[in-house]
Amino acid sequence: MAGAQPGVHALQLKPVCVSDSLKKGTKFVKWDDDSTIVTPIILRTDPQGFFFYWTDQNKETELLDLSLVKDARCGKHAKAPKDPKLRELLDVGNIGHLEQRMITVVYGPDLVNISHLNLVAFQEEVAKEWTNEVFSLATNLLAQNMSRDAFLEKAYTKLKLQVTPEGRIPLKNIYRLFSADRKRVETALEACSLPSSRNDSIPQEDFTPDVYRVFLNNLCPRPEIDNIFSEFGAKSKPYLTVDQMMDFINLKQRDPRLNEILYPPLKQEQVQVLIEKYEPNSSLAKKGQMSVDGFMRYLSGEENGVVSPEKLDLNEDMSQPLSHYFINSSHNTYLTAGQLAGNSSVEMYRQVLLSGCRCVELDCWKGRTAEEEPVITHGFTMTTEISFKEVIEAIAECAFKTSPFPILLSFENHVDSPKQQAKMAEYCRLIFGDALLMEPLEKYPLESGVPLPSPMDLMYKILVKNKKKSHKSSEGSGKKKLSEQASNTYSDSSSVFEPSSPGAGEADTESDDDDDDDDCKKSSMDEGTAGSEAMATEEMSNLVNYIQPVKFESFETSKKRNKSFEMSSFVETKGLEQLTKSPVEFVEYNKMQLSRIYPKGTRVDSSNYMPQLFWNAGCQMVALNFQTVDLAMQINMGMYEYNGKSGYRLKPEFMRRPDKHFDPFTEGIVDGIVANTLSVKIISGQFLSDKKVGTYVEVDMFGLPVDTRRKAFKTKTSQGNAVNPVWEEEPIVFKKVVLPSLACLRIAAYEEGGKFIGHRILPVQAIRPGYHYICLRNERNQPLMLPAVFVYIEVKDYVPDTYADVIEALSNPIRYVNLMEQRAKQLAALTLEDEEEVKKEADPGETSSEAPSETRTTPAENGVNHTATLAPKPPSQAPHSQPAPGSVKAPAKTEDLIQSVLTEVEAQTIEELKQQKSFVKLQKKHYKEMKDLVKRHHKKTTELIKEHTTKYNEIQNDYLRRRAALEKSAKKDSKKKSEPSSPDHGSSAIEQDLAALDAEMTQKLIDLKDKQQQQLLNLRQEQYYSEKYQKREHIKLLIQKLTDVAEECQNNQLKKLKEICEKEKKELKKKMDKKRQEKITEAKSKDKSQMEEEKTEMIRSYIQEVVQYIKRLEEAQSKRQEKLVEKHKEIRQQILDEKPKLQMELEQEYQDKFKRLPLEILEFVQEAMKGKVSEDSNHGSAPPSLASDPAKVNLKSPSSEEVQGENAGREFDTPL
């Protein structure tokens, strides 16, 4: 499907399942706040889970529609009686505390007007079971999106439950349920052989499901379905065969946008199962035949819903950053009516959260009571105050009952008391507990460039949006500002939109925070609202992490800061201004950061702006007044009804990808987005009103500005018929829906005076094509039991008019050829120029002149990358070669003709892949890394040799100094020897000292040599280890890169192959058309009648040949592709096989190097030592022992060539 997620979604939604205990019934005590009377009842649920009903001691039955139930509460969350006497009456039973046995069922038509059903169970376990089961039934998404058949069954169940004490069904209930036309009801009852007087009643056993269905068929006959049934094959027989039914489902009901591999068309066996399920006549079902009755049941069955159940389920990726989602958001959540007067309600927070909202607003003000408890209210208005603590408790109670994904608390903090702000923070910590996100997640630090965590990462967490205290300001100045805070205004000001141009704020009367433009703030309008909120204390500031409100300066500034945890709020007028001036920049901003839009202050009646405006810009928190159910709120409910009603909807891909730029005002097709064509035909309506009035249906489309069409279509008004009006009108066609993933279709029914009956909002991407019932809903999006509209929808990928003929020719060549011939004949008959037509057809120049035109209009030619790495070999015969004028070419054999157009395609070799730019670039990078590594080790070696040379010089100088001293002493001794009295033993002592000095010198040099040798060995080993590790990593990276390059090139080759296939088909058709032209030329010499006969035969045989040749060509192309794919696999495997081979070679190479290394170092040191000692001997500075047997020590600093030695030829090698 266009834009669909890859893979088939496994449905997680659970069907309605009513437990036995709810079916059998349980004893409860029912009580009311305004009465001290308690009523023992037996409470039950019908087996289908439609109604909650109870019978009192007088056997009178009351019903509660489960679709109206909002919540079920027990224990401390349930309502408790205030009257002590009433409490005493209720304290019955001996198992468990009274509080734990209390149940409150909350129900109502909308969020504001709610009622309570208060019950007391006799056991705690029973109270818990019923609470959980009732809440589960009331929030079941499949129950909220039932099939048409299920709604009709619900009406039947209601009639069966509302019986007299004798167990009979009063006919007045039937007349009341189908009140639009009493005469029709009377006639339908008579057709079922039932009494028709309003005061009569009938036994339940006489009103079976089959009788009820016959009654409905008579009350609401469906001639339009009979026509569809006949048109699709049942003209001469009263049934459809399994093949006809299969064609109907696959051709009419199947979505052509679906991938045929993931969502294959139905097969005979599957269709047979459907026939057996819906066909009431078992003998027909066994034969694979479906009657019109079975066909009607199938159309109203669960398999034929207008929206796939997978779209209702949680089917979107929830692991992307928070900024990539639209988030269901509420404005001034506590209000139940207008913005200036009315009651504030704690219950509104529960109701809004239960409805799927994930972002609520808390306008906090300083409490004026002695307890100094902060309150929530709309400042400087006549709205009432509610307790901040009670609101926090309500949020904690209902935060995650319907969705596990994070709650965002948008604080508008006007509390200018540090003590009360500390209380607020304490309540949040204590009541929310571990659910409150106090610290940022380890994976997502509050740093520039780091994206926000995902809804999946933040499951069951509550995040606070409040002003963050600036650490720059001192504590004293903070307190001073806090005490001086003037509470003369109220605003969202969790973040403030600050005009980027001077004077912009003064020129606009709309302020930047919630309700800043209210009339009671005239004095502060010009000043803006930057200081309208109180300074955040340390306690409140510590609660803020991922949602830090900041003043908006410009999109450029936000981009430079690149801090995803900073967000800004925009009043709707400022948001619209930015959207108009900088649409692309607004979308870019919303890819990384959150933005919140809220209604302008002049909407004192709590009306709403259209949220679609800001969804188009990717704004996440588009906050609305939930208490007002206008069109804008209906669109919002339609948006968040899907994806498991989680409150989060993944934005379209182009609004998330950093490499794509999206303009919401685009009018043309966006590259990469598959546009849709949508056609809607309103066929008929059923039970649209309970009055005998005329009705009509309107169709709207909402989406991007180019896609939006308000009141795009309106049917004629039916004449006094609300039961089964039929509209035979042309369908409304939305030719090009540019962004289907953000577009929705609204189908609404009205009475002739314009009174709203019901509607349904359907995402374009989720709509199933075909014949469907649209079960209508009321303003609050609650399903209506009987009203429905029967429609026929066509939806497909958009094809521009330019390519329509080409698409048709490629998809159905036979029909296309026939159509072309038919048009030619019609034109010839019209102009009476048969001879000229034949002459034109016979002219070979005509064919060649058409070729360029065909090439220009071929879609496959557009946007093709001709530099793609594909090396097709030229065919043996040039495709455009023409025979000599007048000559007739003999018909070619099938294989020869196919081979003449078939291009040989060869897979790229590994060596060719290695020449790809990205791979060569990586090799160069590795070359540089190895070069740098060797250079670093060369430097270390040079330094080591210099160090040893210095040491040698020190030893040598010490030796020379000490030897000189001994020789000097020896000279003195020789003078004394010349005296007769001096002893002779002095010379021998000096010789011994010199010998000892020589021995000491020799030993020092040997030690120095050993040390140098060991250090050089260690250094070279370290170099080899580094080289080996580096090369091992290079092998991994190069193999991975080569694999990626291979996959990319091979994918490009396969894409190019598709284009080649299309060109080959065209070439084949061209050649065959040329043969046909030659045959026509041959027939020119014959008389006209014979020529016409031969021409007709030629056309017939030509069509057959074209089909056969194309089929054989496709087979040859398929084999070629299989061979190419197999070769691709082989090459990828060869690449993978190179990795262990290269690693083994690397291991062996360095094993050999390590083995040779000690000897190489020894030889290197010996050679160096020989030269040094020889040099010193010539100068007489070497010890005599070394002069005769020099020690092998490196005593000089070699050149870089000497140091690198064997590395010179290999140091910059790369493994591949």
Curated annotation (Swiss-Prot):
Region span, Disordered: 469-534, 834-891, 967-989, 1072-1095, 1172-1216
Active site location: H331, H378
Any one Gene Ontology BP term: phospholipase C-activating G protein-coupled acetylcholine receptor signaling pathway
Polar residues composition bias: residue spans: 846-868
Domain PI-PLC Y-box residues, every copy: 540-656
Residue list for modification Phosphoserine: S236, S417, S511, S582, S887, S978, S987, S1197, S1199, S1200
Composition bias, Basic and acidic residues: 472-483, 967-979, 1075-1095
EC number(s) recorded for this UniProt protein: 3.1.4.11
Keywords tagged on the record: Calcium, Cytoplasm, Hydrolase, Lipid degradation, Lipid metabolism, Lipoprotein, Membrane, Nucleus, Palmitate, Phosphoprotein, Transducer
Tissue-specific expression: Highest expression in brain. Also expressed in parotid gland, liver, uterus, lung, heart, adrenal gland and ovary. Not detected in spleen, pancreas, intestine, thymus or kidney.
Modified residues (Phosphothreonine): T509
GO cellular component: chromatin; cytoplasm; GABA-ergic synapse; glutamatergic synapse; nuclear membrane; nuclear speck; nucleus; postsynaptic cytosol
Residue stretches of biased makeup (Acidic residues): 507-518
Residues carrying lipid (S-palmitoyl cysteine): C17
Cellular location(s): Nucleus membrane; Cytoplasm
Biased composition (Low complexity): 491-501
Start and end residues of each PI-PLC X-box domain: 316-467
Broadest EC class assigned to this enzyme: hydrolase
Misc. comment: The receptor-mediated activation of PLC-beta-1 is mediated by two G-protein alpha subunits, alpha-Q and alpha-11.
Role noted for this protein: Catalyzes the hydrolysis of 1-phosphatidylinositol 4,5-bisphosphate into diacylglycerol (DAG) and inositol 1,4,5-trisphosphate (IP3) and mediates intracellular signaling downstream of G protein-coupled receptors. Regulates the function of the endothelial barrier.
Quaternary structure (record): Interacts with DGKQ.
Protein name in the entry: 1-phosphatidylinositol 4,5-bisphosphate phosphodiesterase beta-1
Organism (species): Rattus norvegicus
Lineage: Eukaryota, Metazoa, Chordata, Craniata, Vertebrata
